């Protein structure tokens, strides 16, 4: 019989799965649920990644304590609300796994909020995003990268 804590966690995980656009991370959670792997689920849902001085970054995987497509979409939604309709944002990405997908998701979310974006089609170094903001007098810049973190991590910097 499931405890109240397990029931609440199961509901939270299911809610995450319902919004997760990535089958890989959704399946990761479904597998943990099917195995009743509460320690793994608790670790992924006991806290959320938070912004530090250099942006937000962490290990890639499922849940709010990992970098993934849903985490990126939530960050993009918050940024869109902050800068408002009609703003223009430049988005760059590095060559890490999922960086291009995260950048494209970011641009899509901004567009859904009537925020314009310029997105680099191939990987660029972080300073290129910073330069482009000033050169083109843009409102904001986003660089999808985990910077000096391990290659398995990802994240984004906001300028």
Predicted regions: what is each one?
Residues 2-106, 113:
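An N-terminal, well-structured beta->alpha segment
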Residues 4-6, 16-17, 87-159:
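Ferredoxin-reductase
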């Amino acid at each position: 019989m499931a405890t109240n804590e397990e029931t609440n966690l199961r509901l939270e995980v299911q809610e995450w799965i319902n919004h997760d656009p990535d089958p890989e991370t959704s399946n990761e959670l479904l597998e943990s649920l099917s195995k009743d792997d509460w320690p793994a689920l608790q670790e992924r849902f006991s806290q959320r990644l938070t912004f530090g001085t250099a942006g937000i970054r962490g290990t890639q995987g499922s849940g709010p304590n990992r970098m993934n497509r849903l985490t990126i979409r939530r960050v993009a939604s918050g940024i869109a609300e902050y800068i408002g309709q009609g703003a223009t944002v430049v988005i760059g990405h590095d060559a890490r796994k999922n960086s291009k997908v995260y950048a494209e998701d970011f641009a899509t979310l901004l567009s859904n909020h009537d925020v314009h974006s310029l997105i680099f089609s191939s990987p660029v170094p972080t300073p290129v995003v910073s330069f482009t903001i000033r050169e083109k007098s843009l409102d904001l810049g986003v660089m999808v990268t985990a910077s000096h973190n391990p290659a398995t991590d990802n994240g984004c910097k906001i300028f």
